[in-house]
């Protein structure tokens, strides 16, 4: 089953005939691969590991170097990420580059006209399946340097840590209140192997390493920009840790004494229960005997039922009117 966006693109297959095509953005299906016989070549660039690991020949990275006759960009709900990727693609393209932008209306694709107007001609060419399809021709190349997109912040809770983040990373500009509550439960007694799952910019893992220097820190995420941010947060603060891509536990090796997470409770505009359910239901297979799973979550979400089902009991280590920090032992 292909996505709504790809269903709209199917109505315009003549754009693809004999061309080299680069697919980028929030692709979520195998539509690009189905066009292999129609196009002269196909490239796929995604910053999402949960997609990249399930499809063939996907370039999973923060930056992409490549040329194509036609670029097809799938608009995402993350506007900062969209701007970062589109500017990067335009900066390395040639004048006259043809781009199709497709996205769901509810994800804000209508704003593409304002976003790209300074760089060329853009026109809406189709509207169907609650999506908009736009055609763009490049006339004025923007300048793009990755170093210009780094943002930093500090917070009294972080004890002189500086957090580094790229566009689109969760809590990129400031410490979110859920993570702040989770950090209030961290002390220097933490030891052994620690997994910060869904690490974002590396706030939690870096803070644990700072407070408990002997802990062995591993950080994982599905988002390429998050992984790059976590690496830079560690290195710029002279901290050691391992950072790599994993879709929940897909690429996790070994067992841990603590798995800690501020898991996503929404995926853009949809609640992301799948990730949290996998985290809770599979955690015990990745914990050492006596190991702990510690997560922060919105108080209204039904996590206690899952925790009780798979771990028999749980503790609430800290709470506010909005968030709770849950702890279970293996």
From Swiss-Prot:
It catalyses: guanosine(1207) in 16S rRNA + S-adenosyl-L-methionine = N(2)-methylguanosine(1207) in 16S rRNA + S-adenosyl-L-homocysteine + H(+). Keywords: Cytoplasm, Methyltransferase, rRNA processing, S-adenosyl-L-methionine, Transferase. It is an enzyme of class 2 (transferase). HAMAP family: 16SrRNA_methyltr_C (MF_01862). It comes from the Bacteria. InterPro entries: DNA_methylase_N6_adenine_CS, Mtase_sm_N, rRNA_ssu_MeTfrase_C, RsmC/RlmG, SAM-dependent_MTases_sf, Small_mtfrase_dom. It holds the Pfam family MTS. Belongs to the methyltransferase superfamily. RsmC family. The lineage of its organism: Bacteria, Pseudomonadati, Pseudomonadota, Gammaproteobacteria, Pasteurellales. Signal peptide: none annotated. SUPFAM superfamilies: S-adenosyl-L-methionine-dependent methyltransferases. Monomer. This is Ribosomal RNA small subunit methyltransferase C. One of its GO terms (molecular function) is 16S rRNA (guanine(1207)-N(2))-methyltransferase activity. Its EC number is 2.1.1.172. Specifically methylates the guanine in position 1207 of 16S rRNA in the 30S particle. It is found in: Cytoplasm. GO terms for cellular component: cytoplasm.
